[in-house]
Amino acid sequence: MSDTSELQRFLPKDQELLSGILYRIGYWISHVDDTDEGDRSEQVEHQHLLGCLNKISKAPKAGALLNEMAEESCRQEQSWPRWETKNDSILDDVAAAVSLLKSQGTEDEEKSFAKASMMVGMTVARAFREEPEHAVEHEGYFSWLTEKANDMILAVTDKDAHKDLGVSPEEDNALNDLLAILKS
């Protein structure tokens, strides 16, 4: 973490929420449908989750707060087991994060959070079905990420989209639920 932490402007309990929320979204999507593919699918999805978080943490257009949130999600590996036990409250916690960013963040941070959340969800949902796309990891990456998230937001409104996107119906429903919270 840098010397000037964006997360420090929030209360400790809110820092904990924001530090883990992107990881938790990915974990939740990974476990929303039991594909019976065994540990292999979970390992692939986890690798894609961490890769996506790493890219968000380095994307200048994501903004300093989202960079730090993604970085903390990766860095706090010791917190993963605890975060993974909170799947039942994920949508409530996403709503709390949205509310927190509306009240204490900027409009850009709120938009970046929504786009990053959808991208994490989509990356994990598609992880076991296709090879990772090799996106450029520089300033253009967040533009690419934003475009993909916007495509996803359009796609999840189409009930047949999950077929084209390689997403299971359960994941599609979960992504729709996530989108509804992010748009509220």
Which ranges hold each PLM region?
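Acidic, metal/ion-handling microdomains and their immediate structural contexts
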Residues: M1-S184
